Amino acid sequence: MRIRHVVFCLLALVYGAETSDDDLDERTNIFIRDKLIPALKLAEVTKVNFTRLHLCHCSREVGCNARTTGWVPGIEFLNETDRSFYENTCYTDGSCYQSARPSPEISHFGCMDEKSVTDETEFHDTAAKVCTNNTKDPHATVWICCDKGNFCANETIIHLAPGPQQSSTWLILTILALLTFIVLLGIAIFLTRKSWEAKFDWYIRFKPKPGDPLRETENNVPMVTMGDGAGSSVPEVAPIEQQGSTMSTSAGNSFPPGIMPNNMKDMLDVLEETSGSGMGPTTLHKLTIGGQIRLTGRVGSGRFGNVSRGDYRGEAVAVKVFNALDEPAFHKETEIFETRMLRHPNVLRYIGSDRVDTGFVTELWLVTEYHPSGSLHDFLLENTVNIETYYNLMRSTASGLAFLHNQIGGSKESNKPAMAHRDIKSKNIMVKNDLTCAIGDLGLSLSKPEDAASDIIANENYKCGTVRYLAPEILNSTMQFTVFESYQCADVYSFSLVMWETLCRCEDGDVLPREAATVIPYIEWTDRDPQDAQMFDVVCTRRLRPTENPLWKDHPEMKHIMEIIKTCWNGNPSARFTSYICRKRMDERQQLLLDKKAKAVAQTAGVTVQDRKILGPQKPKDESPANGAPRIVQKEIDREDEQENWRETAKTPNGHISSNDDSSRPLLG
């Protein structure tokens, strides 16, 4: 019973498969008769024999699309359902073909019309020739062409001979080995590049030149035969007493004077200057400045690197170490120091520069004088100043800035062009031991072109420096960057902020210094590290300026200082003082201050003399002749008491000295 059921199932499967194939073939014939042929006639296709029309499977990867001959979806009069169902199908009155190739095994299908010999692509051209027996060339692929019905080429499975198999493991290992070799070769070339460069340079310098007498000398050396042996010959050797007129080379040859090869002379000259190569006498080379400096510690860092303290021949120096990526900035600042006649007491003194190999990296050193007090920013963090010190600091800074801005004429080798610093701030101003200042960090400075007709200085990327100290015309991009004086006006604005910072740390009478941590321009309205947009809003849109101490308006000196500061930070660049005018104004105020102090001292001395005449000398009541200790003279006591009484009666409620003449007030602080 079970056997009958199994046989029945097998017969049902076979019958179902045959029925399914018959249904598909009949559906295809109905599609050709009722839809495809009418659509082709509507499309006015006349080169096809409609009585032999059948369908074939076509491969999309070789062009089964609108370019393929007889592509069914390319017929515009068919509906979308038929186009989608017959997407990978073509029609033909000729042959269906299948091609297969090994390694990797790929099969392609398509149509070839009876009257067509070629197609648009090379593949179809080959198929047309194969199916029409028009080629005798051997092919690496296997072809099948048939015309017995719909999709006839799909019925045959092409069995290809197995090709040579390559292990993927060996392929991966081969690739890895090749990559490893390339990497090692690159590392070896990188590590030995200096040696190869030196050898190449040696070859270029000492390669034999055409017409070199070396070969002629070798060819013209007389030969003598030693013994009876044939071919045993050596050059004739001159007597010892005649060898004084020859020069011996490292190769053992001798050449009479005047005919030594030029390249040999060059080689001997180089060998005589060797520093220990083993091919000549050892000579000592002078150490560069980098080899004579001993670094003792880092003192700060900046935009292009860090600053260290060093010892150079017993003198303390500052060494600015540039990063390797900032070599253009190093060369620019070095070139400015070396070629611009920048010897001025209020400009940081340049000592030298060098390239130092530390064994790991190559460092770029710029050596300047060292000031233990550090920058003005650091100095104000630790100290307060009085009016005298304020004038010393700011007047010297203005003097250095005026020196940079002014042009000094001279010969071509000894003239200084007008310059703009472009990064004036308290961190770039050094405080010297005499409480004067020196301007440093000239890496962003700009020189006026020597050609007067060329008035362009920099490109449009002129917004450089510290954002907090940028002038309004730079923040709002209205600066005339082709006019050199515009950069100097921007320097004056930055200098006014430095003057304000220093004034905030000034202490005199009732005027107390501001907290050091808050002495930062615009800190009330900006972050510690503001962006361009934030500074633009504060300085240009809202037109704010750093806040003033209300007591400054009543101070005899600070009110004049604020007048200078307000003029220098004016929003209109043309309304600002020049750096030279700033220096002149502070010179005048400082001189008036010194005159007041001298006049006050003179008046005090005059009062003491007058009192001495009126009171006369008096003996102290406790005078004891028997006492051997030095006696105190009564007139000295009276002088001190009178000075103290004068000071007490002269003080006003605000702590200032009162007088009808302001110039009689002594210097406070």
Curated annotation (Swiss-Prot):
GO terms for biological process: activin receptor signaling pathway; cellular response to growth factor stimulus; dauer entry; dauer larval development; defense response to Gram-negative bacterium; detection of bacterium; determination of adult lifespan; larval feeding behavior. The chain crosses the membrane at residues 171-191. Its EC number is 2.7.11.30. One of its GO terms (molecular function) is activin binding. InterPro entries: GS_dom, Kinase-like_dom_sf, Prot_kinase_dom, Protein_kinase_ATP_BS, Ser-Thr/Tyr_kinase_cat_dom, Ser/Thr_kinase_AS, TGFB_receptor. It comes from the Eukaryota. GO terms for cellular component: activin receptor complex; plasma membrane. Residues 611-624, 633-650 have a biased composition (Basic and acidic residues). It is found in: Membrane. The active site is at D423 (proton acceptor). This is Cell surface receptor daf-1. It comes from Caenorhabditis elegans. The lineage of its organism: Eukaryota, Metazoa, Ecdysozoa, Nematoda, Chromadorea. The gene is daf-1.
